[in-house]
Amino acid sequence: MQKKYVVALDQGTTSSRAIVFDHDANIVSVSQREFTQLYPNPGWVEHDPMEIWASQSSVLIESLARAGIHSDEVAAIGITNQRETTIIWEKATGKPVYNAIVWQCRRSSEICEQLKAQGLEDYVRENTGLLLDPYFSGTKIKWILDNVPDARAKAKRGELLFGTVDTWLLWKLTEGKVHVTDPTNAARTLLFNIHSLSWDTTLLEALDIPAAMLPEVRPSCSVYGTTRIAGEGSEIPLAGIAGDQQAALFGQLCVEPGMAKNTYGTGCFLLMNTGNKAVRSSHGLLTTVAVGAQGEVNYALEGSVFMGGATIQWLRDELGLIRDASDTEYFASKVADTNGVYLVPAFVGLGAPYWDPNARGALFGLTRGANRNHIIRAALESIAYQSKDLLDAMIKDSGERLKSLKVDGGAVANDFLMQFQADITDVEVLRPSVCETTALGAAFLAGLAVGFWTSVTELEYKACIDKHFKPNIDASQRERLYVGWQDAVVRTRS
C-alpha cells in the first residue's frame, strides 16, 4: 500500500491524543482520551503509567479506524510528550515500581535544597541550563529510589529503567526492545549535560542514580524501532521524538536563530531558537535543547508566563464579567483603550524575568469612568505585556534580533490579542492554519526521518500561515503603554 499518512502521538498532562496528518500536513483524524489525575498529598501529582499507555494506545487505534485508514498506509509514528514527568519500571517485567511523578509535583523540594547546600546550584545552571527545582526529573528519580522499598537495590543491580513519557511509550510500543529518549527530553531531566550532550556523571553521583537506568539518547529526527498497531499489519517506524514545547517550536519551523514561538494556554510558553549557541540567561530564563533544520541539536531560551488563559478564566469564574473566553474580544473591542487601567495577574507571584513569588495580582488606574470593557481589555493586554517581558529578555540574552513571532494555542483565535501582541512587541505575529503545532512538530520529525518529506524547505510549503498581524501603532505610543505596564509591575512587588 502507498504510504499516505504520518501519525503523531501527543501525550499531554491531562489527555492522550493521536493525530493523523496527510502529505500536505492537513489533519485527517483526531482521537483523544483523558486519564486520571492523582493527588495523594498536598503538592503531589501523579499519573498511572499503565493508564497513560492504555489511553495512548487506544487513541492510536481509534484515530486510524475513524478515518478508515489501514496501518499499512502509515509511513511513520512520531511522539511528543509532557516533559519532566518521571517513570521507573522493572526491566524484566515492564511493571512500574511507582506511579509517574508529574512535572507539577513538588515533593522533591527538600532534595533540591540539599543539592543547593552542597553548592551544586551554579553547576546545575551551567551544565544543564536548568534551575535546581522539583519541576525537573532528577530529584523525582531520587525520591522514588529513596522511598520505594528495594528500589535502590534493584536499580544498582541493573533491574530498573527510568524514562520520561516518550521513553515509556517507546518501550511499550516496541514491546521492551527499545530504551531511548531524545535530547529535548533528556535536557529536562537535570541529569543531561547540554554541552557534551551526554549524561552528567557529577549529577548522577550527587543524586546517587545508577547510569544503567538511563535511556540511550538519540537524535530527535531518527528511526528508533518499529511497532504494529494492535498486532496487525506491517511494522511501522517509530521515527521522531520531541518534548511538547520543542515539538511546537519545530512544528512552527523555528529552526534558525532569532525565530521564536509563543504557545498561549493556561500560561504561555515562549521559546527562541539560538542556533548552535547555548546562551546562559541573566534574566532567569532556561537554556534548553531544540531541533535544527537537519534534525541536529540546536539550543533555545525558554520562559513561561504563569497566568495567560488562566487570567481569562478568572474573569469568567470569579468575577463573572464574561460567559465564555471568546467573549473577551467583543468587549475589548468596544473601547478604544483601557482608559489607563492595567491588570497585573500575579495571582501566584511573577515568573521570569522578575522571579518574585511574593508579588500579588492588582488592578491599577481605576477611575469612576472605568468599566467592564476596560478591565476585560486590560486582562487581554496583560498576556501580551508578560510575553513582551520574556521576549525582551530573550533578545537581550541572545543578542539575536526577533524576526517574527509564531503563535499557537487556544488564545490565538482572539484577533484582538494577536494584534495587540504585534503592536506591543513591534514584530509581525504569524498565526498558522494548523494550530496543532505540537503534534505537527512530532509528525514533521517522523516524516523527515523516513523520507515521507525531504526537507524543511518542503515543509515550509505545507505549514501555511492563516493570518499575519503587523504592528499598527507608533513607537511613542508603544513606549507609553509599556512604561505604564512596567510601573504597574513595580507597584505589585512593593
Swiss-Prot record:
Annotated residues that bind sn-glycerol 3-phosphate are located at T13, R83, E84, Y135, D244
What Pfam family does this protein match (any one)?
FGGY_C
Q: Which Gene3D superfamilies match?
A: 3.30.420.40
Pathway, per UniProt? Polyol metabolism; glycerol degradation via glycerol kinase pathway; sn-glycerol 3-phosphate from glycerol: step 1/1
Biological process annotations from GO:
glycerol catabolic process; glycerol metabolic process; glycerol-3-phosphate metabolic process
- EC main class here is transferase
Keyword Protein biosynthesis on this protein? no
Question: So what does this thing catalyse?
Answer: glycerol + ATP = sn-glycerol 3-phosphate + ADP + H(+)
Q: How is its activity regulated?
A: Inhibited by fructose 1,6-bisphosphate (FBP).
Disulfide bond positions: none
Q: Which SUPFAM superfamilies match?
A: Actin-like ATPase domain
Molecular function via GO: ATP binding; glycerol kinase activity
**What EC number(s) does this enzyme carry?**
2.7.1.30
Task: Give the UniProt keywords, A-Z.
Answer: ATP-binding, Glycerol metabolism, Kinase, Nucleotide-binding, Transferase
Q: Describe its function.
A: Key enzyme in the regulation of glycerol uptake and metabolism. Catalyzes the phosphorylation of glycerol to yield sn-glycerol 3-phosphate.
Family affiliation: Belongs to the FGGY kinase family.
| Official protein name in the record | Glycerol kinase
Q: Which organism is it from?
A: Shewanella sp. (strain MR-4)
